Amino acid sequence: MMDPCSVGVQLRTTNECHKTYYTRHTGFKTLQELSSNDMLLLQLRTGMTLSGNNTICFHHVKIYIDRFEDLQKSCCDPFNIHKKLAKKNLHVIDLDDATFLSAKFGRQLVPGWKLCPKCTQIINGSVDVDTEDRQKRKPESDGRTAKALRSLQFTNPGRQTEFAPETGKREKRRLTKNATAGSDRQVIPAKSKVYDSQGLLIFSGMDLCDCLDEDCLGCFYACPACGSTKCGAECRCDRKWLYEQIEIEGGEIIHNKHAG
C-alpha cells in the first residue's frame, strides 16, 4: 500500500490519495516538479503552505490542478444570494480576476471557481468605476500576477470535502426521493438495496451522481463515509433508495431516468 501524499496529509484526506477516478496511474510528484503556475494554483485552491519537497499524488493533481475547473459545477455564490444551485452559463474566475476581486471585495475568490450571470452582474456593477484599472491587469506578465497573488493573505478556502454533507450548497438542492408517499414513480421496497457496496446502481452498474446528470464526474462535497463526490445527502453505498428528481436554479426539474 502506498503512503499518502503531503497534500492528503495536510488536508486530512489521506483516504483519497491514489484513487483512480480521474487517472489510471498511481504515484507521486514532488511539488518542485510542478510548473510555478500549477504550484501557485495548488496553493490558492488548498490554502496550504507548500514547499518543493512536499509530494502530491496523481489523484490530487487531477482534483486541484488538471480538472479543478471542470469539477466546479455551480456558481461559488460569493454574495450568498442563491437559494438553489446556479449551474447555467457559468464562467471561470481566472488568476487575474481572483487577485482583483479578492482585493476589491475583501473575500476570497479562488481561481477555477465559477460565477453565474447574476453574480457577474453584481460584480460588474460594483466595479464599474474601476473597469479601466482592471483591464490594465491583463497585460501583466505571469510573474507579476503570481507575485500579486502571493502577496494576498488567503485563508484555507476549505476543500469541498471538509464540509458535512448536510451543509453549504448541498442543502440548497431540493431533492425528492422516489420513496416519497404519493410518488408516481416505482417505490423501492424498504429492504431492497438500490446501490451496491461501491455506490453503483445494482440494476445497471452505473456510477450515477445524485445530481442526476449522467455525465457528471461528481459535484458534491466528498462523502464522509466513502469519499465519493457523487453522494448527495446520504452515502450511496448499500443505499435502499434513489432520488426521483431535483430542482435547480431557475426552477428546472431534472428527472431520474432510472427511477421508474
UniProtKB/Swiss-Prot annotation:
Organism: Homo sapiens (Human)
Record's subcellular location: Cytoplasm
Positions bearing the Glycyl lysine isopeptide (Lys-Gly) (interchain with G-Cter in SUMO2) cross-link: 177
Chain positions found as Phosphoserine: 183
Name of the molecule in the record: ARL14 effector protein
Physiological role: Through its interaction with ARL14 and MYO1E, may connect MHC class II-containing cytoplasmic vesicles to the actin network and hence controls the movement of these vesicles along the actin cytoskeleton in dendritic cells.
Principal cellular location given in the protein's record: cytoplasm
Subunit structure: Interacts with ARL14 and MYO1E.
Distribution of this protein across tissues and organs: Expressed in the immune system.
GO cellular component: cytosol; focal adhesion; intracellular membrane-bounded organelle; nucleolus; nucleoplasm; plasma membrane
One Pfam family hit: ARF7EP_C
Keywords: Acetylation, Cytoplasm, Isopeptide bond, Phosphoprotein, Ubl conjugation
Residue numbers bearing the N-acetylmethionine modification: 1
UniProt-annotated stretches for the region Disordered: 160-182
